[in-house]
Amino acid sequence: GSFALSSGARAVSAVRAALRLPTPTTTTSVPAAAELGIDGLAPVITPSADFYRIDTALVVPQVDPADWTLRVHGLVEQEVVLRWDDLLELAPKETVATLVCVSNEVGGSLIGTARWLGVPLREVLARARPTADADMVLSRSIDGFTASSPLEALTDDRDALLAIGMNGEPLPIEHGFPVRMVVPGLYGYVSATKWVTELEVTRYDRAEGYWTSRGWSERGPVKLQSRIDVPRAGARVEAGTAVIAGVAWQTHVGVS
């Protein structure tokens, strides 16, 4: 019962602490001018401990990398199974990406930007060679969660990743250690599968994900949104000159 769960959590935490991430073949830098130095304004890179979470299960899965596998199957010419060591042999890259929850309210905190280290999903899918009639990938988590992602979003130039690192460290356990999906430009409900173990290449007219089966739209592109951080909500603003600062985002598309 609870003793087994706590023992498993301690074991996986120890494995994570001892893990050394591979060096990325490419990195993305954040311009120094992006940090404006305004007190109260959210930093460009969200600390991992402050990054938002949306969970659909009561228990956080504890997955040892030695036991992890990823199966790619469905409408493909060649089924592929990858283990942790296989994933590490592929060329990892680091990218800066913003994730946001579709249920983030105006002024809400369900958004974060991190440095993600991982293997491009397009390279993994290329090994399986999806058939011409496929248009969706149904990803599955070890806890049963599913997300339906447009195939083109996983294979274009947006650097959708099978992520293994976050902000220079192995993924936090609660954020999907050892492997999760990160897809810039899509809301999490159709892309951000944590503890991912399966990619089923399929079609929208044949399958649906956890949230789309509950009435949410199929493709979930991130829409333009903004937030005022300074002054904070409810703060008293004195007469005279005041600083107003915030953030805006539309990942993959960009804001100009």
Model-derived regions: residue spans:
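N-terminal export signals
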Residues: G1-A11
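Structured, non-membrane catalytic/scaffold regions adjacent to prosthetic-group chemistry
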Residues: R10-S256
